[in-house]
C-alpha cells in the first residue's frame, strides 16, 4: 500500500500511544499518552510558551508541568485531552492530513458504548476522517500471533484483561478485567524504594522509577526461594544511575514489584493474580473450547515484558488446570506492540476494505453506526 492512501493505525494505550501506517511491521511513532500543562504562569514574554504539551515534549518538560493521562485503566476519561493526543498524532508524529486517510483505532475490551460513539464522532466531525474502524485490542494481539482462537492476557500500563477469543470473536461473558497493571507496579516500586531510603514522590520522579522498572525488574519462578537468595547474597543486586549522576542499588525490589501481578495482595488489592484470572476466564468458556484456549495463551502489552513471566505463568496455570491438559504460553518478542501490529495486519487485508465505516455512512446514521459495523 502506498503511504499516500495507507490507512492509519492508532493504538491508544493508558501509558503509550502507538501510531503508524497499515502494512508496516512496527509503529512509526510511540510516545507517552500524556498531556502536560504549565504549573506556573509564564513570565518570559515572547517565549512562546504553550498552554499544553503532548507526549515526549511534555515528558522532557515534566519539571515545570503537571502531567495528566487522559486514558485511565484503558478507557478514555478526558475527551479534550484525548483530542489533543490525536491531533498531535496526526500532525506532529505521523505528519499526515487526517481527512486523507482511513483510520483504525483500538479500544479496551468492555469499553462503554458511549465511548465508542464519542470516538467515532470525534474522528468524523473534528478530524474529517474519510473512513474509520474501531477494533478490540486483545483481538488484534491474537491476529498478530497468527491465530484466530486463543486467550489473550493483555497487560499494559493502566489495565489488564483476559480475553478468550474463538474464531476471531471475543467472548464478552468470559472477559475479565483486572485494575492492576504497569502503573500500579511503578507506584509499588516507588513505595519499596522509599523503604530503602530513596525518596520518589513527584510525577517527574515517577518516570525515573518507571525506567528502573523497565530495565531491571523480572519475575521470579519461585518467589520465596528468590527472597531467600536475595537475602543471603548480593548476586541479584544491580545498580542504576539517576539523571543527576547518583548511583542507587536495587536488590529484591527487582522481582518484588512484578510479583504483585501474581499476588495482588502485596499492593493491597483483594483480587486474583493474572494466572488465576486467566484460569477463571477459561472456566467461564464452553467446556468444548477450553482445550484450544489452554494451548493458546497469548501474552501482549508492555507489562508482560518482564523476563521470566512466561515460565512463571506456565508453572502457575499448570498447577490450576486439569493434569492431562496441554498448556502453551505464547510470548512473542514484539508483544509490546502486538496490538498495533495486529491492527496493521487487519487494516491492510483486502477482505477488510468493505468493513470500514465511511464518512457517508456516518453522515446518514450518526455515531451509532459503530455498533453495526464494528464488533
Curated annotation (Swiss-Prot):
Keyword field: ATP-binding, Cytoplasm, Cytoskeleton, Hydrolase, Nucleotide-binding
Principal subcellular localisation of the protein: cytoplasm
Enzyme Commission identifier(s): 3.6.4.-
Residue stretches in coiled coil: none
Substrates-to-products reaction catalysed: ATP + H2O = ADP + phosphate + H(+)
Any matching Pfam family: Actin
Keyword Ribosomal protein in record: no
Record's subcellular location: Cytoplasm, Cytoskeleton
GO cellular component terms given for this protein: cytoplasm; cytoskeleton
A single GO molecular function term of this UniProt record: hydrolase activity
CDD domains, A to Z: ASKHA_NBD_actin
Family statement drawn from the similarity comment of this UniProt entry: Belongs to the actin family.
Function: Actins are highly conserved proteins that are involved in various types of cell motility and are ubiquitously expressed in all eukaryotic cells.
PANTHER family according to UniProt: ACTIN
Protein name: Actin-1
Organism from which the protein derives: Pneumocystis carinii
Lineage, broadest ranks: Eukaryota, Fungi, Dikarya, Ascomycota, Taphrinomycotina
Amino acid at each position: 500500500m502506498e503511504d499516500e492512501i495507507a490507512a492509519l493505525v492508532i493504538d491508544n494505550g493508558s501509558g503509550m500511544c502507538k501510531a503508524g501506517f497499515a502494512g508496516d511491521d512496527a509503529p512509526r511513532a510511540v510516545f507517552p499518552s500524556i498531556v502536560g500543562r504549565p504549573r506556573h504562569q509564564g513570565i518570559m514574554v515572547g517565549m512562546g510558551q504553550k498552554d499544553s504539551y503532548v507526549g515526549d515534549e511534555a515528558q522532557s518538560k515534566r519539571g515545570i508541568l503537571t502531567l495528566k493521562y487522559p486514558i485511565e485503566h484503558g478507557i478514555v476519561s478526558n475527551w479534550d485531552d484525548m483530542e489533543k493526543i490525536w491531533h498531535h498524532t496526526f500532525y506532529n508524529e505521523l505528519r499526515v492530513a487526517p481527512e486523507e486517510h482511513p483510520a483504525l483505532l483500538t479500544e479496551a475490551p468492555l469499553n462503554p458504548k458511549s465511548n465508542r460513539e464519542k470516538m467515532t464522532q470525534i474522528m468524523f466531525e473534528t478530524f474529517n476522517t474519510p473512513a474509520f474502524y474501531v477494533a478490540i485490542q486483545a483481538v488484534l494481539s491474537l491476529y498478530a500471533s497468527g491465530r484466530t482462537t486463543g486467550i489473550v492476557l493483555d497487560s499494559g500500563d493502566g489495565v489488564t484483561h483476559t480475553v478468550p477469543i474463538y474464531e476471531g470473536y471475543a467472548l464478552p461473558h468470559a472477559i475479565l478485567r483486572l485494575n492492576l497493571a504497569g502503573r500500579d507496579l511503578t507506584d509499588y516500586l516507588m513505595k519499596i524504594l522509599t523503604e530503602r531510603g530513596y525518596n520518589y514522590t513527584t510525577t517527574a520522579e515517577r518516570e525515573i522509577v518507571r525506567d528502573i522498572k523497565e530495565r531491571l525488574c523480572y519475575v521470579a519462578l519461585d518467589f520465596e526461594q528468590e527472597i531467600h537468595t536475595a537475602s543471603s547474597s548480593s548476586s541479584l543486586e544491580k545498580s542504576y544511575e539517576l539523571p543527576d549522576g547518583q548511583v542507587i542499588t536495587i536488590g529484591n525490589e527487582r522481582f518484588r514489584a512484578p510479583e504483585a501481578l501474581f499476588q495482588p495482595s502485596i499492593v493491597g488489592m483483594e483480587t486474583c493474580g493474572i494466572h488465576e484470572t486467566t484460569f477463571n476466564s477459561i472456566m467461564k468458556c464452553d467446556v468444548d473450547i477450553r482445550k484450544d484456549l489452554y494451548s493458546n495463551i497469548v501474552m501482549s502489552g508492555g507489562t508482560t515484558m518482564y523476563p521470566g513471566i512466561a515460565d512463571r505463568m506456565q508453572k502457575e496455570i499448570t498447577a490450576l488446570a486439569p493434569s492431562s491438559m496441554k498448556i502453551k504460553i505464547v510470548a512473542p518478542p514484539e508483544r509490546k506492540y502486538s496490538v498495533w501490529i495486529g491492527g496493521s495486519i487487519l487494516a491492510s487485508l483486502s477482505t477488510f476494505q468493505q468493513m470500514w465505516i465511511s464518512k457517508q455512512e456516518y453522515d446518514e446514521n450518526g455515531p451509532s453506526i459503530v455498533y453495526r459495523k464494528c464488533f
